[in-house]
Amino acid sequence: MSTSSSKKYKLIGLLFLALYVMTHLGFYKTYFIHFPSFEKFQLLHHVHGFLMSTWILMLITQPLLIGYGKVKLHHFVGGLSYVIAPLLVVSLFLITKMSYNKGVLLSSPREAIADQALSIAQLFTFSGFYAMAMAYRKNAARHMRYIIGTGLLMILPGLNRLLGSFYDTDFNLALVISSVLTIGIAV
């Protein structure tokens, strides 16, 4: 592998490290601050958080392994995704369902489902990106792009919470900022 390619893979790992930090800062006031009691949270919240954190850690690790020439280890960690990704999809579905059920108690079913529209879209988009990444696992360029896509989806929830929690940004404005940033990185 050329030095230029190696640097690119390492840069991708560092970008996902930044995503990890941003996401954890975003969830600090809504989740991590409640440590160790986590009184308002159910086991599902913890499982979902663990799976999402694991996925981002895999996104950090995988390009670094390629960048350092550890291809066999990259394949082993990638094999773990066959367990992690389906569990992550199930946790996304269950978290979305739980949020919908809470929303129905506070508003109409129509409003509750509208509030979950982004989560539903992300569930299907993540599933599609992951499926395509695995279908193209022998084509490094395509595989990498689809896997990166799974990570870009995490900008929205993390940055929305970060902007709302730390800067008191209106939800709609935070959504626009997160979306523009995601699209900008993707392009």
Regions found by a protein language model. Name each.
Residues M1-V187:
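Alpha-helical membrane insertion/targeting regions
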